């Protein structure tokens, strides 16, 4: 629903990285008109300094559902 502030496994702060990750993905969508590919997402995460696979999992697997749940 809401991106966790810290990684569940290692405790690293990831909320700020998630915001920058979504901004970079939106930029790719606006420039190319398509979703970013896996290699592009990997490069974005590398550029953000997200090296651990547990933190990468937290960012890549998050689905923002707050707007759908908020009316209830």
Swiss-Prot record:
Report the catalytic activity.
RNA(n) + a ribonucleoside 5'-triphosphate = RNA(n+1) + diphosphate
Residues that hold Zn(2+) according to the record: 7, 10, 54-55
The EC number on file is: 2.7.7.6
Q: GO molecular function of the protein, one example?
A: zinc ion binding
Record keywords: Nucleotide-binding included? no
Tell me the PROSITE patterns matching this sequence. RNA_POL_N_8KD
The cofactors required by this protein are: Zn(2+)
One GO term (biological process): DNA-templated transcription
Domain of life the protein comes from: Archaea
Broad enzyme group: transferase
Pfam families tied to this protein: RNA_pol_N
Q: Does the keyword Metal-binding apply?
A: yes
- Annotated function: DNA-dependent RNA polymerase (RNAP) catalyzes the transcription of DNA into RNA using the four ribonucleoside triphosphates as substrates.
Question: Sorted alphabetically, which NCBIfam families does this protein's record hold?
Answer: PRK04016.1
Q: How does it assemble?
A: Part of the RNA polymerase complex.
Q: Which family does the similarity line name?
A: Belongs to the archaeal Rpo10/eukaryotic RPB10 RNA polymerase subunit family.
Protein name from the UniProt record: DNA-directed RNA polymerase subunit Rpo10
What organism, scientifically named, is this protein from?
Picrophilus torridus (strain ATCC 700027 / DSM 9790 / JCM 10055 / NBRC 100828 / KAW 2/3)
